[in-house]
Structure formats: C-alpha cells, structure tokens
Amino acid sequence: MEQSKKYLKLSSIAVLALAFFSMLQLVSELLFGDINQAAIPEGAPDNILLITRIILFAVAFLLMLPNIYIGIKGMRIAKKPNASKAHIVWAIILLAFACLNIIEPVVTCVSDGMKSENISAVLSIAVEITVFFEYIKYAMDVRKNVA
C-alpha cells in the first residue's frame, strides 16, 4: 500500500512536469508566434523541444508502469470467486483505456512532431493519470470487498 502511494506521488510529479512544460511552450507561442523558434536557445539543435518532450514522456511512462502492474494485480483480485463479472469487465475496460490513451499521444507527437495542435494530446496524459488514480482506488475497494 505504501509503495503504491510512492508511485502515485512520482506519477503526479511527472504529470506536473509535463503540464508545466506544455504551458511554457504555449505561453512562448502566444508571446513570440512560432513555438519552435521562440523556445529554442541560440545554437541548440532544431529538434531540442521534441527531444525534451520524448524524455518527459519516457519518464512519465516508466513511472506509470507500476500503476499498470497494480491494475493487473487488481484484475487478479477481481478474478476471485466472490467478485462479480462486472468487476472483471470494468477492470479490463479501465486498464485498456488507460494504456491506449497513454501510448496514443506519444505516438502522435513522435510521428507528427510537436505542433501546437498536439499540445492537447500531451495534456491528455494528465487525464489518463486521473483514470489510473480511479482505477487504483477501484482495485483497492475490490480487494477490501473480496479478500
């Protein structure tokens, strides 16, 4: 239980870093016009924003892996004889939804580059972290009811 709280805190920090970086880019775009020119220091490689974004995505995703493990563990709990079929279906839906919606923004940003229209995809990761929070609370409730 303590370990899951630690991972939730780390995931929250990663999401805050992503949100802060996205807002910084958005503000620089509003102030200077071209996001790719405004935030790049002189002499830096042209794709430094994309590289920074990919690093932040990688950190956030690695911090979410324990949450995925907790979700799978919650599915195992839902498979116990006292659990209803609704528990199992709900666990599968939440886990699949969270995993797909974490991967999709990363693929979009890597394939299309960091354009201003992709900022919403980046910020959607924060929404998916919320899904993980809800899923973990649900898995813990199932554990209390079934165990």
Tell me the role of every PLM-derived stretch:
Residues 1-31, 44-47, 141-147:
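Cytosolic juxtamembrane helix and N-cap/initiation of the first transmembrane helix
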Residues 2-7, 68-86, 129-147:
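Cytosolic juxtamembrane helix at the C-terminal end of the final transmembrane segment
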Residues 9-15, 97-141:
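Alpha-helical membrane-associated segments of multi-pass integral membrane proteins
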Residues 13-17, 83-100:
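Transmembrane alpha-helical segments of multi-pass membrane proteins
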